Amino acid sequence: MSHSDLPAPCPAFYGNPLTEVYRDQWLLAVHKPAGLLVHRSPIDRHETEFALQYARAMNAGEHVYPVHRLDRPTSGLLVFARDPNTASVLGKALMAGAVQKSYLAMVRGWPQQEGVINHPLREHPTDRRCKDEPQPIRDALTRYRRLATTEIPVAIEGYPVSRYSLVALHPATGRKHQLRRHMQHISHPIIGDTNYGRTKHNHYFAQTFGHSRLMLAATAMVFTHPVTGTTLKLRAEPDASFMQVLSIFGDILATRGSLP
């Protein structure tokens, strides 16, 4: 199967692709689909659609301020502040590690039931403009927990069967591509990851399900509200394309409400 045979990883968006998850006077939280950039990027200068502009449309045309990153191929919870001061306070909380973030990922193989990945990462792993420059190496820590496993009778990479796991990921730091790079580091790359994954496994799922999305979804954030001081628990359910692929886990769909 050639690259030209693969379904397009970046769908065209019609209407506003964001789904509102939470709104108050100071914050707007949405579900971002896979394939949508959060904001303009010098690497993707040709792109014309961004979550930032769609969120602004949901905010009556008023400015919104993204307070954290979400990679283009990652779907899920994305939080905007509705004023600069709230953005500053919440941004500092993120930098201080005071925000709990949860993700779901489908990975190749069966990792241990739970574990901690404490593996420093370089600043710009895929930016060719920085390849000849010395890059700082920063501490990076991710906790993971295995939620479900499956084995399918499909021979990939020379094995008679192929194993996959659904895992919950909790990053304690926020390095670029941290979860994707950490799962690659422990030899359990995320399905659909064209930078750090396994090509043959990615091709199998793209061919089977008709899309080549990254199987990584931001599902929850817990933090102290930057204005009211209350504990805010935000949650975004995985979207249909993500849940479709999870059908290989059988009855996992029946427990959708219990997914972290």
What is each model feature region?
Residues 51, 158-221, 232:
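Pseudouridine synthase
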Residues 108, 170, 224-226:
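A generic structural motif
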